[in-house]
From Swiss-Prot:
Sites where the protein binds [4Fe-4S] cluster: 289, 292, 324, 331
EC number per UniProt: 1.17.7.3
Pathway: Isoprenoid biosynthesis; isopentenyl diphosphate biosynthesis via DXP pathway; isopentenyl diphosphate from 1-deoxy-D-xylulose 5-phosphate: step 5/6
GO biological process, one term: isopentenyl diphosphate biosynthetic process, methylerythritol 4-phosphate pathway
Name of the encoding gene: ispG
Keyword list, A-Z: 4Fe-4S, Iron, Iron-sulfur, Isoprene biosynthesis, Metal-binding, Oxidoreductase
HAMAP family the UniProt entry points to: IspG
Protein name: 4-hydroxy-3-methylbut-2-en-1-yl diphosphate synthase (flavodoxin)
SUPFAM superfamilies in the cross-refs: Dihydropteroate synthetase-like, Nitrite and sulphite reductase 4Fe-4S domain-like
Reaction equation(s) it catalyzes: (2E)-4-hydroxy-3-methylbut-2-enyl diphosphate + oxidized [flavodoxin] + H2O + 2 H(+) = 2-C-methyl-D-erythritol 2,4-cyclic diphosphate + reduced [flavodoxin]
Disulfide cysteine pairs (residue numbers): none
Organism: Nitratidesulfovibrio vulgaris (strain ATCC 29579 / DSM 644 / CCUG 34227 / NCIMB 8303 / VKM B-1760 / Hildenborough) (Desulfovibrio vulgaris)
NCBIfam families: ispG_gcpE, PRK00366.1
Cofactor mode of binding and number, as noted: Binds 1 [4Fe-4S] cluster.
């Protein structure tokens, strides 16, 4: 019998409401494994986080500095724009100063791909819509073979081949997939299999459909992303929706969150997407209630200060900052460190045990920060002993 609208229904054989929380599991599609530098992608390897510098690649010092910032923030593969020969050869001194794998982003001129490989890049991204003739692609493939480099076939709906636009009536998901397969066949014809594929669009729904179609038809590793997603707020939302849907289906071996911002800002969003799906974790998870009329402590300031204090932490643990007695004690007990607010007081938990009760709202922030500092000191000491 159907219940009232909005009433939760128990479906036999699905999940009993008395079973408690069931761990979220995602069955990732098994793709071929390739290696970019020292980073293995595809196969049984975890989803890898990528980004792209927005510096002038010819400015070696500035580019190296941004790569280091990206790496510190959690970036595992970095792509560089190669607009001309000077940019291609700038990769050589850049390569000597950074350890993260580098990908050269190539458009229009296949000779730049060859130069970038000779300069030491680990992989290429070529755009089927503008890389040139079959002969040009063949030369790129031969150079990639010689340097043991991966080639990403990077299809973009904004630069799709004109004949496919005409054939499909626009940059449809089907046209994007056909573009990818056209170039996959070119590479396979030269016995080249170190291939990765991406199908990017600024349309979330088009991205999802294109990647879903492609994933069903090939087992090459996929780099997923929503291109030209926008500024931090809108871009983060579009990326979270698009990438989240794909990752939930098990699709995606590397990802990038594309934001109109400092590329370092992409890292936090990318890692939170992975954390939210239980795929990977980096740094602390902060749980905080949205506040309501029951909240009787200065929760917003407390949560913001906790977040600020934990910037730069890379170890994974859970902190709960809760404002009232409804959900607060339960969430705080489950966290490594947590606080549950009450009337002009707060109860601080560590690993489920009450370690401190603080009276007076003005003392709450200072007391919790003391406990947080103690907790972090213990964590660091444990790491040092290991």
């Amino acid at each position: 019998m159907l219940g009232l609208p909005g009433e939760m229904q128990y479906v036999p054989g699905i999940h009993s409401p008395n079973e408690g929380p069931r761990p979220m599991t995602i069955q990732r599609k098994q793709t071929r494994e390739v290696r970019i530098g020292k980073v293995r992608i595809g196969g049984a390897n975890p989803v890898v986080v990528q980004s792209m510098t927005n510096t002038d690649t010819r400015d070696v010092e500035q580019t190296v500095e941004q790569i280091r910032q990206l790496q510190e923030a959690g970036c595992e593969i970095v792509r560089l724009a190669v607009l001309n020969e000077d940019a291609a050869w700038a990769i050589k001194p850049i390569r000597s100063q950074v350890s993260v794998p580098l990908v050269a982003d190539i458009h229009f001129d296949h000779r730049l791909a060859v130069s970038a490989l000779e300069a030491g890049v680990d992989a290429l991204r070529i755009n089927p819509g503008n890389i040139g003739t079959r002969a040009a692609v063949d030369r790129v493939v031969d150079a990639a073979k010689a340097h043991n480099a991966v080639i990403r076939i990077g299809v973009n709906s904004g630069s799709l081949e004109t004949d496919l636009i005409d054939q499909y009536g626009g940059p449809t998901p089907e046209a994007m997939v056909e573009s990818a397969f056209r170039h996959i066949r070119m590479l396979e014809d030269r016995n080249f299999g170190d291939i990765k594929v991406s199908l990017k669009s600024s349309s979330v729904s088009r991205c999802i459909e294109a990647y879903t179609l492609l994933s069903a038809k090939c087992d090459y590793p996929l780099h997923i992303g929503v291109t030209e997603a926008g500024t931090v707020l809108r871009g983060s939302i579009k990326s979270a929706v698009g990438l989240g849907v794909l990752l939930w289906q098990g699709i995606g071996d590397t990802l990038r969150v594309s934001l109109t911002s400092d590329p370092v800002a992409e890292m936090a969003v990318a890692w939170e997407i992975l954390r939210s799906l239980g795929l990977r974790s980096r740094g602390p998870e902060i749980i905080a209630c949205p506040t309501c009329g029951r909240c009787e402590i200065g929760l917003i300031a407390l949560a913001e200060e906790v977040e600020r204090r934990l910037e730069g932490e890379t170890e994974s643990f859970k902190v709960a900052v809760m404002g009232c007695v409804v959900n607060g004690p339960g969430e705080a007990r489950e966290a490594d460190l947590g606080i549950a607010g009450g009337r002009d007081k707060g109860i601080i938990f560590r690993k489920g045990e009450i370690v401190r009760t603080v009276k007076g709202g003005s003392n709450l922030l200072a007391a919790f920060m003391e406990e947080l500092d103690t907790f972090l000191a213990h964590r660091r000491a444990e790491r040092k002993d290991d």
